[in-house]
């Protein structure tokens, strides 16, 4: 039996039931377009929040962790001859500095996985301008390395990061702090620590991240300035930030750094577990909604083909009586289902792209988010089309099997 005859019969049935064919195709179209739009929107939103996270969090942070007193030293000196216990163990008072930091910095910079490495010290301070005061924190950094990691330049609204790198007594402050203290570039600002140390700096630049808490409290100064403010020597460094060429490998590489250096490692994933959990929930919700829509579309195809078989039962019997085998009848109805799936997939891809494009033009205008974050990835369109075709195939397979088992003698007699 020629495949062309099967196709011709299938097309004849589809054309005879134009409205049902159109309704079934629209169901697939709607399902695929929503699949594409929802995935484009969710992936765009995830990328936006991930970008925001990585703009403020290093891929890997190395630091000395606080330790609880234990019996390790007693066990070392007394051996196994005695059992040593510590009653009411407490946190050990220890310096937070990293030992020989510049050697470690050089080793991390030469690591092939590293993109940028920056030392850091953070101090809690009171910033003042005359009688005006604001609580904040100042990060002592190599500002050029820090800019390479977090793109501070893109947030600057006055001055530049280079101005700070060439000014030993400069400071970059957030726009919220500048507004609250009535400061502009070139003005002086006084920093005071909890131990009473003070230092007068002048404002080299002002940044705006649109995150209110950051803009009102965050400051950047040169490493040596914060060391002087804390009355520490030039080797005093408490944190080392590392950005990787591939940030998705932070957990694996972080474990390697922890084993080699002996310092505690915090990756961007462990520092932002709630954000990652929220991303997973968003993905689950979006996929659940879209899969439900496609399943409903599949049931639509199933019902329409079932009705078509019921209405064409005599024609099917005549086909079988004239030499069509059961597999040919299956092929006819599978062809119809796939035709509906392909038609719906094609129009669904076009509608999905149109919805995504329209969505990307919706103006938000909040913070640094101007438009609705929508991504455009070919994989979403391919996945949507495949899912639509597969759903259509299975939706048509069951009715096709039913049609193939029709007994022509019984139907014609009836």
Spans of model-derived segments:
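Short acidic/glycine-enriched loop/turn elements at secondary-structure junctions
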Residues: 93-202, 228-230
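C-terminal membrane-exit region of the final transmembrane helix in multipass inner-membrane proteins
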Residues: 11, 377-414
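Hydrophobic alpha-helical transmembrane segments of multi-pass inner-membrane transport and secretion
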Residues: 18-45, 280-315, 338-347, 394
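Mechanotransmission and gating elements of multispan inner-membrane complexes involved in transport
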Residues: 66, 177, 185, 190-286, ...
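Hydrophobic, regular-secondary-structure patches
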Residues: 42-135
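Short, membrane-interfacial amphipathic segments enriched in basic
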Residues: 1-8
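Transmembrane alpha-helical interface segments in multi-pass membrane proteins
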Residues: 306-308, 314-360, 383, 387, ...
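Short juxtamembrane loops and helix-capping segments at transmembrane helix boundaries
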Residues: 356-382
């Amino acid at each position: 039996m020629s495949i062309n005859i099967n196709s011709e019969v299938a097309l004849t049935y589809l054309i005879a039931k134009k409205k049902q064919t159109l309704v079934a195709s629209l169901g697939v179209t709607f399902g695929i377009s929503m699949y594409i739009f929802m995935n484009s929107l969710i992936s765009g939103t995830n990328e936006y929040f991930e970008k925001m996270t990585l703009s403020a969090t290093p891929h890997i942070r190395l630091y000395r962790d606080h330790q609880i007193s234990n019996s390790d030293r007693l066990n070392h000196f007394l051996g196994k001859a005695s059992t040593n216990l510590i009653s009411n163990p407490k946190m050990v008072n220890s310096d937070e500095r990293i030992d020989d930091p510049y050697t470690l910095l050089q080793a991390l910079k030469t690591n092939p996985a590293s993109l940028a490495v920056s030392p850091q010290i953070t101090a809690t301070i009171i910033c003042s301008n005359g009688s005006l005061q604001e609580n904040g924190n100042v990060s002592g950094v190599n500002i050029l390395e820090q800019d390479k990691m977090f793109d501070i330049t893109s947030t600057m609204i006055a001055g530049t990061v280079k101005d700070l790198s060439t000014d030993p007594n400069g400071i970059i402050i957030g726009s919220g702090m500048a507004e609250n203290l009535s400061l502009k570039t070139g003005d002086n600002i006084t920093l005071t620590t909890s131990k009473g140390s003070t230092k007068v700096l002048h404002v080299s630049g002002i940044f705006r991240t649109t995150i209110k808490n950051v803009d009102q409290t965050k400051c950047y100064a040169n490493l040596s300035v914060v060391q002087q403010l804390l009355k520490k020597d030039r080797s005093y460094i408490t944190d080392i930030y590392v950005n990787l060429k591939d940030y998705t490998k932070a957990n694996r590489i972080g474990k390697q750094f922890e084993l080699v250096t002996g310092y505690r490692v915090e990756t961007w994933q462990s520092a932002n577990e709630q954000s990652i959990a929220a991303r997973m929930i968003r993905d689950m919700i979006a996929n659940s909604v879209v899969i439900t829509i496609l399943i409903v579309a599949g049931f639509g195809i199933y019902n329409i083909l079932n009705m078509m078989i019921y209405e064409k039962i005599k024609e099917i019997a005549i086909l079988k009586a004239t030499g069509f085998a059961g597999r040919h009848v299956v092929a006819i109805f599978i062809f119809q289902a796939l035709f509906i799936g392909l038609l719906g997939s094609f129009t669904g891809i076009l509608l999905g792209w149109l919805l995504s494009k329209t969505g990307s033009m919706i103006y938000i205008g909040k913070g640094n988010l101007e438009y609705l974050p929508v991504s455009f990835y070919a994989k979403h369109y391919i996945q949507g089309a495949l899912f639509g075709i597969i759903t259509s195939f299975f939706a048509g397979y069951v009715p096709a099997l039913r049609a193939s088992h029709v007994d022509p003698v019984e139907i014609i007699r009836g």
